[in-house]
Amino acid sequence: MEIDILIVGAGFAGLGMGIRLRQAGLDNFLILEQASGLGGTWNDNRYPGAACDVPSHLYSYSFENNPNWSRDFAGQAEILTYLERCADKYGVRPHMRFRRKVVGARFDEGRGTWSVQTEDGRTYTARVLVSSCGILNKPSYPQLPGLSTFQGLVFHTARWRSDAALDNKRVAVIGTGASAVQIVPELAKKVQALSVFQRTPGWVLPKPDKEIDVAVRSRFAKHAWLQKLARLMQYVRMEVLAPALLRTPKWLEMGRVAERMALRYLDEAVADPVLRAKLTPGYRIGCKRILLSNDYFAALQRKNTELVTSGIREVTPSGITTEDGTEHGYDAIVLATGFKSAEVHAPFPVRGRGGEELGERWKDGAEAYLGTTVSGFPNFFMLLGPNTALGHSSVVYMIESQITYAVDAIRTLRGRDLKTLEVQKSVQDAFNQRLRGRLARTVWATGGCHSWYQTRTGKITTLWPGFTFEFRWRMRRFDAENYSLDPFPKREPARVESRGQVRPGVLS
């Protein structure tokens, strides 16, 4: 099947790209999604308590405010409903194909097109390929000795078993990150015994979450400018946090203030000094993702809950043995161990010029130009590519910035009748050299921890090291001067002989 634009992934990024393409009059596109429905991470993560840690008004498209958010921080089901409504309102759903897992893509240098294969044997040919798979799509499974021998249930939070009956069971949760602080309070309410296995404590702040009054929602619906103002205020409030992550001497005190707030919250929430010591981080705030929760500490102090800080020696058929020799028996093990975020920017094999594979190019860490294009891979765009995620604000803002850039580039490709456009290697290298210098000064590099922001060697491939408005300014237009633009060969008019036969030329 031939198509102008092929988008892989139907989450916030893929759906947003489809909407903007339609608004630009570029209707010849398809969106391939491996799941049975749209939503991306909000379709995958259905565990109890799943919710966003970015305010609702900001975690949405700027062109489609939702006056009916029920809470300041929306839950998974409400976000998924919002995305489904957007797909219908903007007419993108007919462009979507579900259960189409992409297993490979190869660039045809002769034709200037991408050939994309799916798991079910289909092949799509497209002039432009857009990867919108995001960075939270490949669960990270811990390499624990004996895990396969466990006779109870084992599953990852991103692959939640809706049929799992955990009431009155003995359950272990491995991990204490963003998903754990949401699921632990929910599980603690219904299981017989809950063990939370912690390797490194996280910095936890209270979550400023509450129900949004019906009257407030009504005013937002009636006066759209009020909600836009609320969104702007949330944006500014979160953007102010960015300097605290940059860790330059000028801004160090802001980070220390946040640490004091978190420690005060811990002191007030946890009475037991031994437990409090176990929950006190030994690295700078922001080095790992800051956790927001109002009930995580309370859940850890329930009579049926324990925090285990001894390392896991092995998993046995009946439970877990820790390094201190203790044997823990369980009916189920829940893996709240996050995603391979630093390693999944190439979620399927992508082969560019000369057959070079993107994953192989990135074996020492992903790099791109503005997180969106890669030299050697013409007519290829990424949404939420390398170094476009955030430690302080909404990635939807970044996604929309990239979409603006990509749509402008596609218009350039079509308007100038170009065969290919490809970022110059020297431009990409210079951009990443400056980026590495900025990242080296951030708390993510200097804060004394190793996080999912980094590769195994410590290279930070996920986060943008600055203000989001700087990124948006850089993405406001397609900078064609930094690209190699290859036009189609000029077409010679076919010569027609007297007998009406067409001589070999462009038409042959």
Feature roles, as predicted:
Residues 98-113, 306-323:
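A conserved short coil-to-beta-strand element within the FAD-binding core of flavoproteins
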Residues 43-54, 144-148, 292-297, 352-379, ...:
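FAD-binding beta-loop-beta segment adjacent to the flavin cofactor pocket
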Residues 397-400, 404-508:
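C-terminal active-site-capping segments
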Residues 141-156, 321-372:
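Central helical "cap/lid" subdomain
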Residues 66-85, 97, 174, 250-257, ...:
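Short beta-strand to alpha-helix junction loop
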Residues 71-136:
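Feature captures the FAD/FMN-dependent oxidoreductase FAD-binding
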Residues 3-96, 198-199, 268-274:
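Beta1-alpha1 glycine-rich phosphate/pyrophosphate-binding loop at the start
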Residues 2, 6-12, 16-17, 21-24, ...:
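Rossmann-like dinucleotide-binding core of oxidoreductases
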